[in-house]
A protein has these predicted regions:
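Amphipathic alpha-helical segments of tetratricopeptide repeats
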Residues: 45-52, 86-90, 123-130, 164-174, ...
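Alpha-helical linker/edge segments of TPR/alpha-solenoid repeat scaffolds
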Residues: 150-153, 187-191, 225-241, 248
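Residue-level detector of the short coil/turn that links helix A to helix B
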Residues: 34, 74-76, 112, 152-153, ...
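Boundary/linker segments of alpha-helical solenoid repeat arrays
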Residues: 54-55, 95-96, 131-133, 172-174, ...
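Conserved alpha-helical positions within TPR/SEL1-like repeat arrays
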Residues: 1, 11, 21-32, 57-74, ...
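Helix-capping and short linker residues that terminate individual alpha-solenoid repeat units
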Residues: 51-52, 71-72, 93-94, 129-130, ...
Length: 254
């Protein structure tokens, strides 16, 4: 079921360096923030009608739409979003199940439940591979990488995910996907102390953003370049101070 609405689904992706714009998979454009509660109410009426008439396609569409709007309404509504994305998962076709798992992964990440988030993004990845969807696989890898890098993080896993995302984005000629991956690789390289490598990745991200006319991402990448260069200079300064202190100590012993 759900093949009729599968073609209408629009996949929206977030910037890895932004926590304010959730990466939501939705069946239609987002509702303006001020009308979200009313939109939820309308979609619930639509859902009731679908249930009464045995319309599985409409039921999947309604559950997805309600879940997404609850996510957009903020953290206080994430648990309600999970309820509807779970219902969506139960009635959806394979593309719909991919979408439901992506959204459930995002919800659990918002609730600081990384194990549940990872499990759902892994399911999404499996469905993407099953559908032979390189774009879906790229997004799933990106989401898994972001969770792996959170907090103390599993940096090797996060880097492997970002590298796979970059590979897929190149295959798809997806500039935004490449930019996402480059920024994530830059962040991870900076964490590992490979600041010159981080600068390279951020410069790639900035160039892609400029090509796409995305001033916000371009400026963000430019700031990250400055941070990475600053970290590199600081490391050089500390190394110089240590070497100077070692030379001074050696001189005192002579």
């Amino acid at each position: 079921m759900g093949r009729g609405c599968a073609g209408r689904r629009l996949l929206l992706r977030a910037l890895p360096l932004s926590v304010s714009e959730p990466s939501l998979s939705r069946s239609r454009p987002a509702s303006p923030p001020k009308v979200l509660p009313q939109a939820v109410k309308c979609y619930k009426h639509f859902l009731e009608s679908c249930l009464e008439n045995g319309d599985g396609v409409g039921e999947a569409l309604a559950c997805n739409s309600i879940g997404v709007d609850y996510q957009l309404m903020g953290e206080a509504y994430v648990k309600q979003a999970i309820q509807y994305h779970t219902k969506h998962l139960e009635v959806a076709d394979v593309p719909g199940k991919y979408i439901a798992h992506v959204n459930l992964g995002l919800c659990y990440a918002a609730l600081a439940m990384p194990e549940e988030a990872v499990a759902n993004h892994q399911h999404a990845l499996r469905y993407a591979i099953r559908m032979c969807s390189l774009a879906g696989e790229s997004l799933a890898c990106g989401n898994l990488g972001l969770i792996a890098s959170a907090g103390e993080g599993d940096i090797p896993t996060a880097k492997a995910c970002a590298e796979r995302q970059l590979q897929l984005a190149r295959t798809l000629n997806d500039n935004r996907g490449k930019g996402d991956a480059y920024r994530q690789l830059g962040v991870l390289s900076n964490i590992q102390g490979a600041h010159d490598e981080a600068v390279h990745y951020f410069e790639q991200a900035m160039q892609l953003a400029q090509q796409e006319g995305d001033e916000h991402v371009s400026n963000s990448a430019r700031c990250c370049i400055g941070v990475a260069k600053g970290n590199a200079s600081f490391d050089d300064y500390i190394s110089g101070m240590v070497a100077h202190a070692a030379d001074a100590t050696a001189g005192e012993h002579h």
